[in-house]
Amino acid sequence: VIGRLDEVVVDCADPARLATFWQAVVGGEIVRQSGEWVAVVGPAQITIGFQRVPEAKAVKNRVHLDIAVDDLELAAAAAEALGAQRVGAPVPDPVGGFQVMLDPEGNEFCFIVGPTLVEDDSTAE
């Protein structure tokens, strides 16, 4: 092991706005707030940092967050009320499904339903 994951960082134009959005989506509390940097520590003790950068988002994310929910439609509607947008229709799969979303700055994320790796320890070694 070389190191440990400390946090996931999102480059953005408005750290406070995105932190408030993501706190409403995943829960937790806002910590380490400055004009250039805001972080949210979620209930699972995963930290999402939001860092101000001068350039706008230009291409599709290479990494995205999957957020486990009980109901895709309810979650998508609640996120839309906070400024998110849906990307297409929900996508079914054999064990559940997912809805691709954009946060208020256009970063992709997914709401997922069905078994998750956190709940399913059969993949643990």
List the predicted regions and their residue ranges.
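Vicinal oxygen chelate
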Residues: 2-10, 31-32, 39-41, 46-51, ...
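Short, solvent-exposed beta-strand edge segments and adjacent coil->beta transition regions
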Residues: 5-7, 60-64
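Short hydrophobic/aromatic beta-strand micro-patches
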Residues: 9-11, 66-68
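Amphipathic alpha-helical segments
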Residues: 14-29, 75-81
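Residue-level preference for nonpolar/small residues embedded in alpha-helices
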Residues: 14-15, 71, 98
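A short, compositionally biased
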Residues: 33-36, 73
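Short connector loops at helix/strand junctions that flank enzyme active sites
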Residues: 35, 43-45, 58-62
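Short, flexible, solvent-exposed loop/turn segments with mixed acidic/basic and small polar residues
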Residues: 52-57
